[in-house]
């Protein structure tokens, strides 16, 4: 990718790092999933032709923004979709490919310096993707969810609202992240994959997003903490504790594990297919995060700021 490594707001992550806790916390996440979810997610396998179609559509969508993205970076982005959907219930592979493309191109937007954002160029590309892969009604829902996500990402980059919600309490923080982490968008572009009436309604009302936000965000925040500190970003729940204080960190981490367990146990009240989709998303995101290059180092060629 044609990108430089941003140093704006960079901090000394040697003084503020979760690296000392990496092995123990990964073990505790895994034990929690083994105990409360049990069924390990499986990866959706795209054919070479399907992957090439996805990457070509991704390249076409971001080309108007003047950036070239490597296949390696696209494959890093698409991994979360391959691991976090529910392959045993997929009924529409065209909708699945739509999620692959929309996920990847909005990842680029999220990783991009906001000075490069151009709604007039990018939104028509999102609409084109939706109209290619979905029927008319679902295309409109997916497009509006995509538009809302990229608009929110742009408007909250340096917002006092974001600062207040991200630095006050876990409750305020997770309220903000329902939209900011993209899970509401995810659900509204994903429901056509399954053609399941109950899940469709939970996606459209945003209950699906609210049920899975903490399970996604806590994992994402732990493994992206060092990167986000290095870039001066505040959107991380572990900023709400002193990670250099081992006792304080462990208490905070346990509270967040308890949040995840509470949500997972409540998810078990939903119908079986909806349960599977929710839990495959939360658990699959953990599998992807712990195996993906994006989270291996604070800054590398698949997670660096696009400038």
From Swiss-Prot:
Alphabetical list of Pfam families matching this protein: Terpene_syn_C_2
Residues reported in the UniProt entry to bind Mg(2+) 3: 220, 224, 228
Effect of residue 107 to A/G: Produces R-cembrene-A
Binding site for Mg(2+) 2: 110
Reaction it catalyzes: geranylgeranyl diphosphate + H2O = cyclooctat-9-en-7-ol + diphosphate
Cofactors, names only: Mg(2+)
Superkingdom of origin organism: Bacteria
GO MF, one example: metal ion binding
EC number: 4.2.3.146
Record motif NSE/DTE motif, residues: 220-228
CC cofactor note: Binds 3 Mg(2+) ions per subunit.
Short sequence motif DDXXD motif: positions: 110-113
Enzyme class: lyase
Entry annotated with the keyword Nucleus: no
Bilayer-crossing regions: none
Outcome following mutation: residue 113 to E: No change in product (cyclooctat-9-en-7-ol)
Keywords: Isomerase, Lyase, Magnesium, Metal-binding
Annotated Mg(2+) 1 binding sites: 110
UniProt subunit comment: Homodimer.
Role: Catalyzes the cyclization of the linear isoprenoid intermediate geranylgeranyl diphosphate to tricycclic cyclooctat-9-en-7-ol in the cyclooctatin biosynthesis pathway. Cyclooctatin is a potent inhibitor of lysophospholipase.
The record's note on its domains: The Asp-Asp-Xaa-Xaa-Asp/Glu(DDXXD/E) motifs is important for the catalytic activity, presumably through binding to Mg(2+).
Family: Belongs to the terpene synthase family.
UniProt miscellaneous comment: 3,7,18-dolabellatriene produced by the Trp288Gly mutant has potential antibiotic activity against multidrug-resistant S.aureus (MRSA).
Protein name: Cyclooctat-9-en-7-ol synthase
């Amino acid at each position: 990718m044609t990108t430089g490594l941003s140093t704006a707001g960079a901090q000394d992550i040697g003084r503020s790092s979760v690296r000392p806790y990496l092995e123990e916390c990964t073990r505790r996440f895994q034990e929690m999933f083994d105990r409360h979810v049990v069924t390990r997610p499986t990866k959706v396998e795209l054919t070479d032709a399907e992957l090439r179609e996805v990457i070509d559509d991704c390249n076409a969508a971001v080309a108007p923004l003047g950036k070239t993205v490597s296949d390696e970076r696209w494959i890093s982005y698409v991994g979360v979709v391959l691991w976090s959907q529910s392959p045993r219930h997929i009924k529409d592979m065209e909708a699945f490919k739509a999620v692959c493309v929309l996920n990847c191109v909005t990842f680029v937007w999220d990783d991009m310096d906001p000075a490069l954002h151009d709604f007039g160029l990018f939104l028509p590309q999102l609409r084109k993707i939706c109209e290619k892969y979905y029927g008319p009604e679902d295309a409109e829902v997916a497009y509006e969810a995509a538009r809302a996500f990229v608009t929110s990402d742009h408007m909250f980059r340096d917002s006092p609202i974001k600062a207040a919600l991200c630095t006050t309490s876990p409750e305020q923080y997770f309220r903000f992240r329902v939209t900011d982490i993209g899970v509401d968008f995810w659900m509204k572009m994903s429901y056509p994959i399954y053609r399941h009436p109950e899940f469709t309604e939970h996606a459209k009302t945003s209950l699906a997003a609210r049920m899975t936000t903490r399970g996604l965000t806590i994992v994402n925040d732990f493994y992206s903490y060092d990167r986000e500190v290095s870039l001066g970003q505040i959107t991380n729940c572990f900023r709400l504790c002193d990670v250099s204080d081992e006792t304080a960190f462990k208490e905070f981490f346990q509270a967040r594990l308890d949040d995840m367990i509470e949500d997972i146990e409540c998810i078990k009240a939903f119908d079986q297919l909806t349960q599977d989709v929710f839990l495959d998303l939360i658990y699959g995101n953990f599998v992807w995060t712990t195996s993906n290059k994006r989270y291996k180092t604070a800054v590398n060629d698949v997670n660096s700021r696009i400038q």
